[in-house]
Structure formats: C-alpha cells, structure tokens
Amino acid sequence: MRTNPTTSSPVVPTLEEKNLGRIAQIIGPVLDVVFPPGKMPNIYNALVVKGRDTVGQQINVTCEVQQLLGNNRVRAVAMSATDGLMRGMEVIDTGAPLSVPVGGATLGRIFNVLGEPVDNLGPVDTRTTSPIHRSAPAFIQLDTKLSIFETGIKVVDLLAPYRRGGKIGLFGGAGVGKTVLIMELINNIAKAHGGVSVFGGVGERTREGNDLYMEMKESGVINEKNIAESKVALVYGQMNEPPGARMRVGLTALTMAEYFRDVNEQDVLLFIDNIFRFVQAGSEVSALLGRMPSAVGYQPTLSTEMGSLQERITSTKEGSITSIQAVYVPADDLTDPAPATTFAHLDATTVLSRVLAAKGIYPAVDPLDSTSTMLQPRIVGEEHYETAQRVKQTSQRYKELQDIIAILGLDELSEEDRLTVARARKIERFLSQPFFVAEVFTGSPGKYVGLAETIRGFQLILSGELDGLPEQAFYLVGNIDEATAKAMNLEVESKLKK
C-alpha cells in the first residue's frame, strides 16, 4: 500500500495523548525502551528523546524502532550520536515513521537523514512531507519503454549505454574515480537535459560532500541568487554519522526523488554515493541488534534490505527515476556479497579499472568488464551495435597479445596483429576524455561528446583512415576532429624541435 505525501509535518503528540516510554539500556547507537503495557509503538515508528545531559546541554535524539522484544520493550536505532543519554530518560513515540520535506522547497538545499537543513540557509517549508518507508509501485503503474540516456561521456555512451529510468552501478576500488565520474554526470545531465537531480551521500567523506556542493554552486547547478531555480537536492549522511543515519539516508534521498516523479511528473536522476556504505551500515546495525551474521560477516537480511531500496527506484507512467550508484568494491573483489547483491538489480555496470587509472587514462572505465542490457541492435541500432562490438573485439585481441608482447616484443607479431595493437592503443587513448569537473586537475577544458560524434570517431579509427596519426594525439580529447588537430600540432612541434 503506497502512502501519498501529506500536507503537514508529523507533530509530536500533545502531553495528554503522548505515548511515553523510558530508556532501559543503551548499547552505542542502539536503545532499549520500555513502554506501558498495551502502548507499544509500531516497527519503523520514530521515537524522540528530549532532555538535558549531566552538564545541562539540550539533547534531542530521534530513533527508529527496529525490534519488539517482548516485556513491553522495543529496540531502536539512533539517527544521531547518543552522547549524554542516560537510563530512565523519557522517550516520546511520535506514532508515525520518519517523514521528510519533499517538493520544490528541497532544491538547492542540503539535508540530513531526518530532512533537517544543514547548510545554514534557514528553515525549509515543511508543509509537504512524506514518510521514508513506502512500498514499491505496483506492476500496473510501471513503464516499460526502452530508451537511451545520453551522458556525453564517450566510453559510457558507446560501450555500456545507460537506460532512461534504469539503474546503473559504478564499480571500483578506492581512488579510481567513482565520485569524479558522478560529479561529471550531474554536471552534464543538468546542462544537457535540464532535469532535477537528488544526490544521496551515503557514508562517504565529508570533504567530498563539501567539494561537490562548492562545485555545484560554481557550475550553476545550485543557483545561490535564486535557490528555487536550483536543479539538485542534496542529502548527506557521511562517514562520521552513526550507522542508523547511514542506513536510512538513502531512503530519505529516494523519498525526495519519488515526489518529483509521482507528483511533479518529472524525470529525476538519483545519485547514491556509495551503495556499499548502505550495506555496511545495515551490517553494523544488524550486529548491534544481535542478528546472526551471514556470509563474510554481512547481515542475513542483505538481499531484503537491498531489494526494498532498489525496487522503489523505477519508471512509472507519471515519470522516471534514473539511478546512478557508486559501488565500492572491497579489495577489488567483485564476488564479495555486497557488490554481488547489487549486480542483480542493475541495467548497466560501469566498471572502473585500477590498471587504466595507473596508465593515466581517465575516466578509467574498463571497456571489456562494463556491461549494459541496452547494447542490443533493436534498441541502439545496427551502426552503434556493430561499432561497439568491433571496439570490444579489438580491445580483447590486444589484451590477449599483451603477454606475447611482454615476452617477445612487438616485432614478433604478425603484420595483422601489429595493426590491431596500434588501433587498440589509439582506441584505449580515445576512450579517455577531459571532464568539466576535473579541469583544475588536468588543465584541459571539459568536453561533452554527442553519441553520433562518438560513433563516427571510433568508425574512423577502426577503418584504418587514422593509422598514420600518433597515438598520443588521441589522449584526452573530445571528438575525433580534435584528435586530428592535435596530431597536426604535434607534427609542427616536432619539426620546430629539429
């Protein structure tokens, strides 16, 4: 049963109708609360602890009911630090799940898991709120249209195209460029499509969250002069937050995105950085609640938790949510239960390679490991499909020959294989691209490359028309015309040196 947004914020009950409990036990972020007989709160109800600590500081902690233990006890997980809480403190049952502000008032603002603004720009209009726990849309409401979502990033659009209203995973270990790729996608999509985005920062670095906010202000995605004209809402539950906040912040972001889809009937982009931290927070909470761990120490409810989040991210007849999720891969092991469970829900995977990052090829997207259900001739067309397959075949052949080259050298290869290697190296470099958000690092202005331009460029390389150009001419350029211009400049420079 889907609940619609309400037009009033959840109010803590008045003194006469308050359902009061008392803290019986505190284990880190987990509280046991005793309620009067027959007054037990429901699962997922929000509880509020108000009072003062031993030095007189005001305490206001919101918790969420996770278990009913019997003997009039409930076990709840805190959404903020439990410092200063004591046994015997009063706990108020709000009688409803956590609800957060939704709609136009959220654009250009930063929120925490509770939907409270944390950007020092004053209060937010909370007349329209929505509970963070909802069921997924019914089958009859779903939209099954297949269409490509152009990103302007060559390697993505050609080899693993994104589906409009689909779910995309960015897989990679630490430091290979997941967050930079997400920032570039937000930038390109806001400029090219003019759509609304919601960014959920789940358990990532606070510094990155701050950088992203500043970047958005500079690029105009967040309009400081007129906040209402901004194109993005930000929801942060970063590394320093308790596991309860990190576990629920993804749902807060999703609830805001659902409102734009269902009520405003818009196409929305939902970015989650990082979905692994959502699983990790769930694992911490599961251990604190006393559940028996499953494979590799993860929670036994891993698939259920992931499914309840992912199934709400979908396209309906009203609008679509296209979700791009960064997935940290522990120890670069794709068979780890967290990334493996995520794989099952995705329409496309963009796998980032440490080998390519070490070569300085950015975005470090692996052309052979990245996949998409959209790369079919009936969806993308014969020309796109054939070009993508030939690029993959050439890259695969180069990969197979690398051992022979390392042992015997290039001269021992046949003429045909030498030509394949030369073209594969050009393709590898042409798959790199200067990003708008990385201009400060690369010194090169960012480039947005349309799909037709991308296909034309790779067809020219594969046809052999550009065999005479040096491979460094293809590195960090936009379309193929820039590569030929760069080759001419390199030739002029080399002549001047002589």
UniProtKB/Swiss-Prot annotation:
Q: How does it sit in the membrane?
A: Peripheral membrane protein
Supply the alphabetized keyword list.
Answer: ATP synthesis, ATP-binding, CF(1), Chloroplast, Hydrogen ion transport, Ion transport, Membrane, Nucleotide-binding, Plastid, Thylakoid, Translocase, Transport
Any GO MF annotation of the entry: ATP hydrolysis activity
Identify the GO cellular component terms for this protein.
chloroplast thylakoid membrane; mitochondrion; proton-transporting ATP synthase complex
Q: Membrane-spanning residues where?
A: none
Location in the cell reads: Plastid, Chloroplast thylakoid membrane
Please indicate if the UniProt record lists Translocase as a keyword: yes
State the species of origin: Elaeis oleifera
HAMAP family per record = ATP_synth_beta_bact
- Function (record text): Produces ATP from ADP in the presence of a proton gradient across the membrane. The catalytic sites are hosted primarily by the beta subunits.
Under Gene3D superfamilies, the record lists: 2.40.10.170, Bovine Mitochondrial F1-atpase, Atp Synthase Beta Chain, Chain D, domain 3, P-loop containing nucleotide triphosphate hydrolases
* Gene name per UniProt: atpB
Q: Which reaction does it catalyse?
A: ATP + H2O + 4 H(+)(in) = ADP + phosphate + 5 H(+)(out)
Self-association state and partner proteins as the record states: F-type ATPases have 2 components, CF(1) - the catalytic core - and CF(0) - the membrane proton channel. CF(1) has five subunits: alpha(3), beta(3), gamma(1), delta(1), epsilon(1). CF(0) has four main subunits: a(1), b(1), b'(1) and c(9-12).
The record's family statement is:
Belongs to the ATPase alpha/beta chains family.
UniProt-listed Pfam families: ATP-synt_ab, ATP-synt_ab_N, ATP-synt_VA_C
Residues that bind ATP: G172, G173, A174, G175, V176, G177, K178, T179
- What is the protein name for this chain? ATP synthase subunit beta, chloroplastic
